[in-house]
Amino acid sequence: KGFEYTQMVGFPVAQGYNNSDEFKWCKALSFHSIKIPLMQNKFSVSYYESAVYGNYFNPAYLLPAPWALISRVSGFSENVLSGISFQTNILPCFSISTDFMMNDIDLKPFIKLKWNDAAIRGAFKTGIIYTPKYSLFRYIKLDYCIVTPYTYTSCDSSDKKYNFSDYTNYGLCMGTELLPNSHQLGIV
């Protein structure tokens, strides 16, 4: 089985800065990912990106190219998230997945291992899923997720009334249910 490519465009609704009951329909969300299976589909790696912006439509986010690079080189002000995920299914009925997502990072202090100065905005999630063939349970899942401060939050300075750069739809978070600066251990 070969690689999988996914492309999606959606149109969430922007919430007002000063009035949380005020909304506007001029926001766009683009998402794409590529998943590459390895070791006869027992291991896969995926790279994904999403961009959220508003008051215009940017066709650059329809290209199957690195959007983080497009955004930085072109000077666009969109909020671009990039991530990489790994999944392994080496044993039957048992899978392990890990996901790293970056919202923003200052690379110079990060490379110098000065974590407090790197302004890391991102999330990490890892988990184990067991799906027994003969059991009362469909699956058993254990996972851990952490979201650093200010992740998903972004301010669009070009519009003083609506925030077109945050990952919300009608004021509700489109990412994980966890708010920035939080973590969670889950057992299902």
Give the location of each predicted region.
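Signature for the C-terminal beta-barrel architecture of outer-membrane proteins
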Residues: G2-Q184
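C-terminal amphipathic "assembly/sorting" segment characterized by alternating charged
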Residues: G186-V188
